[in-house]
Amino acid sequence: EIGPQQTLFMPGCWLKEGENEILVLDLKGPAKASIKGLKKPILDMLREKAPETHRKDGEKLKLTGEKLGHEGAFTPGNGWQEVRFATPVKGRYFCLESLSSFDGKQVSAIAELDVLGSDGKPISRDAWKIIYADSEETNNGNYTADKIFDLQESTFWSTVNKATFPHQIIIDLGEKQTISGFKYLPRAEKGAPGQIKEYRVYIKTDNFSL
């Protein structure tokens, strides 16, 4: 990711007059390959890797017509909050939709999230994958959606400031589960920035429409 390793600099003396064929064997490769003549090699330009986000170009979650699993509101403040459903719901894909925040801003944040099984205890998060997140802040830090189950209460998922409500995140639990509720941990800082206020939960056996 730095200097000749990202530009694959080839000294001109290696080339013959006229037409040359240059073959590059690369596992990753750039988005577009190009060749350019330079007077000096690029040796000190760092290309920083941007964190991978969980929303592909053109994707937009469609919840119209989906069965609502639960809706409610959290209470303001730091620390874990537990939500129990009136009736357990079976499914593999867990969608949490944030509708508002306590600080009045458009940002939503989650430090950690647990999904509760039929026995009321957190199910294993080993097989979890983030299928979709409508917004993830990566310019001012690495606040991607996978932070909600990294076992680190100091890290968190955060949406971008300019993104407006509602915000959604979809988790693939790895297999079908009987879900009795969930637990939510806001950010640990004073005032719990981005703490979700009103929310909805959708649970499906098959993935959501994106």
Region locations from a protein language model:
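Solvent-exposed beta-strand/loop surfaces of large extracellular or lumenal domains
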Residues: 1-8, 64-78
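An acidic-aromatic loop/edge-strand motif
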Residues: 2-4, 12-61
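Short, solvent-exposed coil/turn linker segments
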Residues: 10-11, 122
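Aromatic, loop-rich ligand-recognition surfaces of beta-strand-rich domains
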Residues: 52, 60-63, 76-127, 135-138, ...
